Amino acid sequence: MASEAPSPPSPSPPPPASPEPELAQLRRKVEKLERELRSCRRQVREVEKLLQHTERLYRNAESDNQELRTQVEELSKILHCGKNEDNPKSDVEVQTESQAPWAISDYYYQTCYNDDSLPSKETELCVQQSQCAQASALDPQDESHIDSGSYAGADATEGVSHRQEDAVTSDSQESVSALAEGPALEGSSLAESLRAAAEAAVSQTGFTYDESTGLYFDHSTGFYYDSENQLYYDPSTGIYYYCDVESGRYQFHSRVDLQPYQTSSTKPNRERRLKKRRKEPGFYTANEEKDLSSEDQKVCSVEYINCSEDEHSGNVKKKARTDTSHKSSPLQLTVAVSGDTVESPGDDNSASSKDERIGESESEPEEGEITDSQSEKSYDGDSSSGDRETSEESDDEDEERIWPPCIRVIVIRSPVLQMGSLFIITAVSPATIGREKDMEHTVRIPEVAVSKFHAEVYFDHDLQSYVLVDQGSQNGTIVNGKQILQPKTKCDPYVLEHGDEVKIGETVLSFHIHPGSETCDGCEPGQVRAHLRLDRKDEPLVGPALSKEEKELERRKALKKIRVKYGLQNTDYEAEKALKNPKYKDRAGKRREQVGSEGTFQRDDAPASVHSEITDSNKGRKMLEKMGWKRGEGLGKDGGGMKTPIQLQLRRTHAGLGTGKLSSIDDVHLIQNKSKKHWDKARERFAETFTENKPRKETPGAVPWVTGTAE
C-alpha cells in the first residue's frame, strides 16, 4: 500500500495589522476637527461682535428717534398755538411777535404781578383819569403837584390823548373795512393798507401802535414792546425785559440809566439822605440807579447810550409831560421817577413842533421839572419836598431789591495764578471755582490740592448776600484762617462779607463786595500790582550769607513746597519701598547665595620686586613665552638683549632735574623727616614718664616716697 502523500502545510494566519496607521489617521482627524472648532469659535466671536455693534446702533437710533419725537411734539404744540395767526409781509415798523397773547396772570415783574393781588390795569387807568380830572378842576394853577399815580409806567391822560387814540383806532378800523370791501383804497398805497391791517390785528391782542416811535404800548402792563429786539420796556424804571415762553414770565434783560435832573434845592436833601444811608449796616446791599456794574451792562445784548445833560438841557425846559401814553415812548419819554424829570435816550427830531406846542399848552409840567414859568410861580416847598422824599425812598428800596452788588475777587497769593488778577462775580448767574479745564469755571485754579468742582458762589435773595458753598472738596476751604467744613463733605452756605480771604489749596483770594461800579484800592489790579512791585524793590537784591543751619532750614522748606505741589505732604519717605513689596523677588540675592561671586576687585598677588623672579602665572611672562622667550635668555630676536631687571632709581625730594646723582633704593637709607623725629622723641619721653610713675602707683599712699636705697 502506497504511502499516502504528505499533506501540504496549512497556511499560517496573517499577522495582525499594526495599530500605528490607525492612530495616525485618528490624530489627523482630531487635528482637523480642532482646526474646524477653532475657526467656528472665531466666527462665533466675530458674529457676537457684529451683534453687539448692531445692538448699540439700534439703541442710538432709538434714542435719536425719541428725541425727534419730542421735538416734533413741541413743534406741533407751537404750530397749534400759532395756527390762527396771520404773519403777512410788512414793514419793519409794524412787525409783531408771533406769540399767543399773554394773560394778566402770566406777567411777571419782580414779584409785583400776581393774579390775585393786583387788579386790572385798565381799571387803574380809569381811576387815575378820574383823579386827574378832579384835581385839575379843583386847582388848575397847581397842576405840577399832581402825582403821576401809584402804578409806575401808566401816566394820567387827558382829552388830547383820548382824541388821538380815537383817531388812530377809527383810522385802523376804516382801513380794515376798506380792505375787506374793495381790492384797494383810494389815495392809499399798499404799505399803508398793510400797516392798517397789522394795526387792526394787534389791537385785538391789547397792544396799541405808536406811529411816532414805531413801538407798541400794552395797557394791561404799561410796557412798551420793541418788535426789532423783541423786548419789553418799563418806562418807570428804565428796565428792558424779555418774555420767557416756557415759564410765562418776564425776565430781566438790560437797563437804561435814567439820568436824573434835579434842582438845586433837592440836591442837598438827597446828599444828606445818602450820607445817612451809608451809615446804615445794610447800605452796601442796595444799588442806586447810577451804581450799575460794568459787567452787568456788558451782558445786555442791546446797548443804549444815555443822553448827556448838556445835549438835553434845552429840551427838558421845552418839553412837558403830555397825557398821551402813546407818544411818550421808551426811546423818547418824559416820566416822573422819584420826583425828578428823567428823559430816556432817543431821537428828539421825531416829534414835531406842533405837538410840542400842544403839549406846552394843554399838559401839566412834571414835578420838579425846570420850566420857563417856574420863576413866576411859587410852589409849596414842604409838601413837594415831602412827596419827593417818600418817592425817592420807595425807588431806592426798589433799586436795592432789583440790583444786588457784585464781587471783585483779587488773587493775593498763588503758585499758579498771577498775583493781582481780577475776577468779577455778579448775581445774574452763580460762579464756580475748580481745577477742571473743560467745566468753564469762573475762577480756575490748576492746582493738585484743588478739586475739579471745588466751590460755588451765588447770591441768596432770601439772605440778600453772597454765599459760598463747598462742593465736598478733597482738602476743604479755609475762610479767614478757619476751615468752614471737613474735607469730602458738602457744607452749608457760608455768608461772605467784604474783605473776606478764602484759601483754596495754596491760592488765597480776597473778596470785595461793592455796590454798582464802586471799587477800593484793594480790588484794583493796577494798585495791587504796584504795591507788589514796591515790596519787591524794598527787598535786598543780595541777601546775607546763610549759615549751615539756615541752609538746612531753607532746604526743608523747599522740600515741603515740593511735597505740597505733588500732593505728598501726608506720605513718609520710604527708602526701600520696592523691596518691601511682597510681589518683589530678589533674584540677585538668591544668585549671590547659591553661586557666589569672585572677588576680582581684590588684588591677591604680591607686588613686583627686583630681587624675586616673576611667577609663571604672570601675564607678561606668558606673553613673552608665547613669542619665543625662555628663562635665562635675553630679550630680543637673537636673545642678545638685557637680562637683568631695571633698577629703581631715587632722587632727592624737592630737587630739580639733573641736580644730583640718581641712586638705587638699596643704597639709600631713608632719612627720617622732622615730624617723625618729633614723634620718636615724644614716645621716648612718654615711656620714661610712664616707667617712673608706675612704681609710685604700686606703693601704698600712706608711705612717703624716699629716694635712695633701703638696707
Swiss-Prot record:
Keyword Acetylation: yes
Pro residues: bias regions: 1-19
Gene Ontology terms for molecular function: identical protein binding; nucleic acid binding
Modified positions (Phosphoserine) in chain numbering: S7, S12, S344
Domain FHA: 431-484
Keyword vocabulary terms for this entry: Acetylation, Angiogenesis, Coiled coil, Cytoplasm, Developmental protein, Differentiation, Phosphoprotein, Secreted
GO biological process, one term: cell differentiation
Modified residues (N-acetylalanine): A2
UniProt biased composition (Acidic residues): 361-370
All copies of domain G-patch, residue ranges: 616-662
Positions of post-translational N6-acetyllysine modification: K661
SMART domains with a match to the protein in the record: FHA (SM00240), G_patch (SM00443)
Domain of life: Eukaryota
Localization (cell): Cytoplasm; Secreted
Region (Disordered): 1-23, 137-184, 260-297, 311-400, 579-623, 690-711
InterPro entries: AGGF1, AGGF1_OCRE, FHA_dom, G_patch_dom, OCRE, SMAD_FHA_dom_sf
Protein name in the entry: Angiogenic factor with G patch and FHA domains 1
Originating species: Mus musculus (Mouse)
